[in-house]
Amino acid sequence: MKKILLSLLAVMISFTALAQTKGDKLTITMRNGTSQVWDLTADGQTPVSKITHTADGKVGFVMTGMEDFGAFEIYDINDINNISFSIYHESEVGDVNLADPSATDKTKRLYKYLQLNYGSKTISSVIANVNWNTKEADKIFKATGKYPAMNCYDFIHIYVPKQGSNGWINYNDITPVTNWADQGGLVSLMWHFNVPKTESTVPGTDGSGVTCTPSETTFKAANVFTAGSWENKWFYQEMDKVVEVLQKLQDAGVVAVWRPFHEAAGNACLKYGESWGKSWFWWGYDGAETYKKLWQTMFNYFQTKGIHNLIWAWTTQNYNGDANTYNNDADWYPGDQYVDIIGRDLYGYNATKQAQEFKEIQARYPGKLIALAECGTDANSNTATAGIDEAWNAGAKWSFFMPWYGSNMPSNDWWKAAMSSKYVITRDQVNLNATYVEESAVNAVKNMGIGTNFGNCIDAVAMWMNMNSNSVSDFEKAWGQEPTTKPMVDFL
């Protein structure tokens, strides 16, 4: 069920609640502390069919079949503290459609959980340092008493020969990931895909000889697609290493948000300036078409290898709400059929700028979850990132947020505020079988509509305005669900 705390002081509307699923209830809580529970649906019936609010401040309940007789129970709005809806959500995953058509049910369930919370709550996350552990998460727990819900691991050092030697990571030891998952944590994975600096360079057991930076290597992304080229051999050799680990994780029941080839455009979309046209990583250096082909090649290769435990997240870049300075990077998007989540990396952004980014990205990629894939302090200017509550209330309702380590890591005070926020899900609150989350209509997401059975309720005033021109099914589609056969709510 999904709870929506609806302040009637802010909403001058009346609506009809039609039967669709069993177990839906409404609770009206009075200012004197008493409460009354009404069934909206029970065994396919609808005891309460209409709730009315009149101009003189009276709230009335109308019974099914008794509409002609008016309300059977009437309250003065001044006596009401709030009304909460407990609306049931099916927990089955048959309606989840991921980029990977063969995604496991467990993978779909993770996405369903992200989807259920989208616009209502945001998932706390952090990047691992160095990359295959929970040290940063442990620091956050020490500072706040709570673990972030999700830990992100990076395959950045998987190129090192003789993994596990000389103090390097042994990625085939998946216990740092499985232990986290066993404790209730969610998992995300990324890959700083290093390549040799030259064709003749042999990566050292000390980690030397590789880079992601295009100016430091002769590796050409466009040559990856030429069979027999050294770029082609390296690309598939390294993918096979990652596939081996992903298969072990899949066999262990671990599913993950997967974010490869991030920040591809770099400054390629900048219209002018010293860094104009420059990509930050080799995978973006040969342009958008080559980049998209890299993404699609990896996606298809993982499919052929039987990897079906991933939710694919792509990172958009370079719009920054400044169309005079930047072109957007829509040309770099691999395509809806290859992407499940859109991420954005923002450092030192205030709440207003975050909200602007969120809304622009959401408008460009409707139907996709939008996440703050990286965030934190801007180390160059020492500008802190906005607090979660501040950004949320401004309209930046990210699916999840992930601060970076080191000089980018937000302060302990920032983390304390974040982990105590009513909008933030911490590890102890994760429930992949959840069928409801609490959501305040006044503070809830303004852009995704009411969703399936009241899911992801919009701002109360916006609800009143939008429902005059949009059907429930339109909002359900926006939320990413198939429209219901009978709408839960018709606004009059």
Feature map (PLM): residue ranges:
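Alpha-helical scaffolding within the catalytic cores
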Residues: 132-140, 171-174, 244, 316-333, ...
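Substrate-binding cleft of extracellular glycoside hydrolase catalytic domains
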Residues: 160-300, 304-307
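Bacterial Sec-dependent N-terminal signal peptides
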Residues: 1-22
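N-terminal module-boundary/linker segments of secreted carbohydrate-active enzymes
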Residues: 86-170, 178, 389, 426-462
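Compositionally biased alpha-helical segments
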Residues: 20-90
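Substrate-binding cleft of secreted/luminal carbohydrate-active enzymes
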Residues: 122-128, 368-449
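Aromatic- and acid-rich polysaccharide-binding/catalytic face
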Residues: 151, 328-351, 404
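Aromatic-lined carbohydrate-recognition surfaces of secreted/lumenal glycan-active proteins
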Residues: 125-127, 259-262, 295-327, 368-380
